[in-house]
């Protein structure tokens, strides 16, 4: 059994449902410390984070990831227990197999091989690992990034091990992500008997034209890296629970996935302008869970694309599609951030898995990336 496969199975067996780490990072420290990494555990509100660094020189290449996994869902629907790593039909099954314990194992083994082969490499290597990526993500990577920024540690490159590949290993690198901004809109009416609408004010009826306009609005055209900004309603709550009562208010939750062609302030102003145009009495609270980030084609993406081509023969594509990731925090302190990992077709699903044939090539790609940047 390859070392990467063995370590992947070790990590899957640790039932680290978010925000638990369940000893995953302790195992990583056991492996990294003998290589010369200075390992620091940073805890915050029940979340375990690891910052490990070998060397003090620039450039600093960081590998980032998360040890937490999403809940299993109904256990009786799994073909084999989710925290018992099981191989069958050329695949390794278990929660976290694709997202993202294989990536972490591959990164660590790649670093071990690289350090042993090139003890006098230039620059430094770092690991930023959290147990709070699948949850609120308020006490994980963002906490470590703030600590690194406060003490002036400069990151030059970062590879996040998210499962970015689509069909085969290496077909997609994420070089950015859209931002995410949510709004909670409360439209106020006047509650009353449904038979006497003239004595009430129905907020659902009132807000319908405004919602239709928001749905139809073209927020931007996107750009060469991003799809256009999208606006979607996620929840709508109104009514007193009776069929003969006009509600006093309606609450609408919505979300923007926005690209660099728009700004937070600009989107907010346009929403308020539409609501005001329709004469609504309303309250609107905003929350931003991430700003868009983008690493244009350059030394990091080129180094990884070359590593992928050398190992797999696949010509990779750069993409910014998908949801948010911890890359949004790292991009605030690191000029070049990309995400790369195994195929994502089974992530968060029952019977999550990775094809065994991809495991060692993934490790080799991470190692070749180190060689391209630090030799």
UniProtKB/Swiss-Prot annotation:
GO MF annotation: an example: cobalt ion binding
Catalytically driven reaction(s): N-succinyl-(2S,6S)-2,6-diaminopimelate + H2O = (2S,6S)-2,6-diaminopimelate + succinate
Named cofactor requirement(s): Zn(2+); Co(2+)
Biological pathway: Amino-acid biosynthesis; L-lysine biosynthesis via DAP pathway; LL-2,6-diaminopimelate from (S)-tetrahydrodipicolinate (succinylase route): step 3/3
EC number: 3.5.1.18
Keywords recorded for this protein, A-Z: Amino-acid biosynthesis, Cobalt, Diaminopimelate biosynthesis, Hydrolase, Lysine biosynthesis, Metal-binding, Zinc
Keyword presence, Metal-binding: yes
Domain of life of the organism encoding this protein: Bacteria
The keyword Metal-binding is assigned to this record: yes
GO terms under biological process: diaminopimelate biosynthetic process; L-arginine biosynthetic process; lysine biosynthetic process via diaminopimelate
Annotated Zn(2+) 2 binding sites: 99, 134, 348
Cofactor note: Binds 2 Zn(2+) or Co(2+) ions per subunit.
CDD domains, alphabetized: M20_DapE_proteobac
Active site: 68, 133
Residues binding Zn(2+) 1, per UniProt: 66, 99, 162
Function: Catalyzes the hydrolysis of N-succinyl-L,L-diaminopimelic acid (SDAP), forming succinate and LL-2,6-diaminopimelate (DAP), an intermediate involved in the bacterial biosynthesis of lysine and meso-diaminopimelic acid, an essential component of bacterial cell walls.
Family: Belongs to the peptidase M20A family. DapE subfamily.
Subunit structure: Homodimer.
The protein's name in its UniProt record: Succinyl-diaminopimelate desuccinylase
The gene coding this protein: dapE
């Amino acid at each position: 059994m390859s070392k990467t496969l063995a370590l992947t199975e070790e990590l899957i067996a640790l039932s680290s449902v978010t925000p638990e780490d369940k000893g995953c990072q302790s195992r990583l420290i056991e492996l990294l410390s003998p290589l010369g990494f200075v390992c620091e555990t940073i805890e915050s509100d029940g979340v375990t984070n690891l910052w490990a660094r070998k060397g003090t020189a620039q450039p600093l290449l960081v590998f980032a990831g998360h040890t937490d996994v999403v809940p299993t869902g109904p256990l009786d629907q799994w073909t084999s227990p989710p925290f018992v790593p099981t191989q069958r039909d050329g695949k390794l099954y278990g929660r976290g197999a694709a997202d993202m314990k294989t990536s972490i194992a591959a990164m660590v083994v790649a670093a071990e091989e690289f350090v042993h082969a090139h003890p006098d490499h230039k620059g430094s290597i770092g690991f930023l690992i959290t147990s709070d990526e699948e949850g609120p993500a308020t006490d994980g990577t963002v906490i470590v990034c703030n600590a690194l920024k406060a003490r002036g540690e400069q990151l030059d490159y970062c590879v996040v091990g998210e499962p970015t590949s689509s069909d085969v290993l290496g077909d997609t690198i994420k070089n950015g992500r859209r931002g995410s901004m949510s709004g909670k809109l409360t439209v106020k009416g006047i509650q009353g008997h449904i038979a006497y609408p003239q004595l009430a004010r129905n907020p659902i009826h009132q807000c319908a034209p405004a919602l239709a306009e928001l749905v139809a609005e073209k927020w931007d055209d996107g750009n060469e890296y991003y799809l256009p900004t999208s606006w979607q309603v996620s929840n709508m709550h109104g009514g007193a629970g009776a069929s003969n009562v006009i509600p006093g208010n309606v609450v609408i939750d919505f979300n923007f996935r926005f690209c660099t062609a728009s700004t937070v302030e600009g989107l907010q102003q346009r929403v308020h302008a539409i609501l005001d145009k329709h004469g609504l009495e309303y309250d609107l609270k905003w929350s931003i869970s991430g700003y868009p980030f983008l690493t244009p084609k350059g030394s990091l993406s080129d180094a990884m694309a070359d590593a992928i081509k050398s190992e797999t023969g696949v010509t990779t594509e750069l993409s910014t599609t998908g949801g948010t990731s911890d890359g949004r925090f790292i991009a605030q302190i690191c000029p070049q951030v990309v995400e790369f990992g195994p195929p994502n077709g089974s992530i968060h699903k029952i019977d999550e898995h990775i094809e065994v044939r991809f495991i060692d090539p993934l490790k080799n790609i991470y190692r070749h990336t180190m060689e391209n940047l630090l030799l």
